[in-house]
Amino acid sequence: MIGITPKGKQEEVMALPAKGHIVVLGTAGSGKTTIALLRAHHLANIPNGGRVLLVTFNGALVKYMRGISDSNSYKLVVENYHKFARGYLNCRGKMPRWNGILSPDEKTYYVGQALEAIKAQHPTESTFRRSKEFFVDEITFIQRFGFAGFGEYYEAERIGRAAANIKRENRKWIYAVYEKYNELREAAGRKYDWDDLAFYVFNELQDDDTDRLYTHIIVDEGQDFSPMMIRSLVDAVAEGGSFTFFGDVAQQIYGGRLSWRDSGIKADRIWRFNVNYRNPATITAFAKDITESDYWEQDSDMIEATTQIAEGPKPILVKFSNKKC
């Protein structure tokens, strides 16, 4: 196993009980990925304990985690979310053998077809003057938050969607395009796209009364996950098991500020890693100035590094005369 000894709050998180929900928020470079991997090994080595899933969003991080781990235990599985999702739906007989998931380009095509179909029915509606890309983005927003119907979408706060200003009374037109998109997709024999896969996993888990495969699930880089991804993983944990969320919510990813509070996680407290072992103080101070600017959406969950271990030169700012340089 990697030769790193947890320190301070890291050590406290390692010692937490193997049950319930745990949330760990930290700055970049505070050791979240390392502790996620160490905790996964710890849980996998509990005598007579269950299986452990360490899940992240991208394949590159999966390869990195496997590369620095020397564990061959069948009890520890490291994979990205979409592999978990496809595997689960497949074992439930809900994943087509070929071409079951639309590619991003195919999704854009079917959204465009849906837009034209609804627009033809309401040619004077100004909402349909927006671009096809706008509708793709808004439908993705609907999918990632897993709204159960139009009512939930109508009432939803525009988290991370300030740039896509939509009056509530006009949301019905977007939802009509969304429903038409689903209709066209299903008619073509394509049940899922990459953005609503988690929605179907969650719904399938609601109807699944068989024993859960994993006793413990650990999410690393949780800020990369949509709310529906998190909700599905929370529901995939066996009764009496644990769910651990490691996230850097100081990052703005997907245009949506993922809050663990909106994702089905029930934690009594938040553990915070605020010691930066990677970036020098000069870089951290520069990043802090950016987060305090008008260009950055403020968030109460953001963790500010209080200590920097590394030292280094000040960052160099380069200004160009135009965007083409």
Identify the residue ranges that each predicted region occupies:
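Class I S-adenosyl-L-methionine-dependent methyltransferase module
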Residues: R130, F134-N165
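Conserved P-loop NTPase-based nucleic-acid remodeling module centered on helicase motor cores
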Residues: Y64-I139, Q143
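Conserved helicase motor core of SF1/SF2 NTP-dependent helicases
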Residues: G3-E12, I22-G100, K167-N170, A176, ...
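Structural motif
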Residues: E125-F135, R168-N170, A188-D193
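Short coil/turn segments at secondary-structure boundaries
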Residues: T27-A28, G151-A156, R190-F199
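Intrinsically disordered or highly flexible coil/loop and linker segments, enriched in small
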Residues: A120, T124, F145-G149, A187-K191, ...
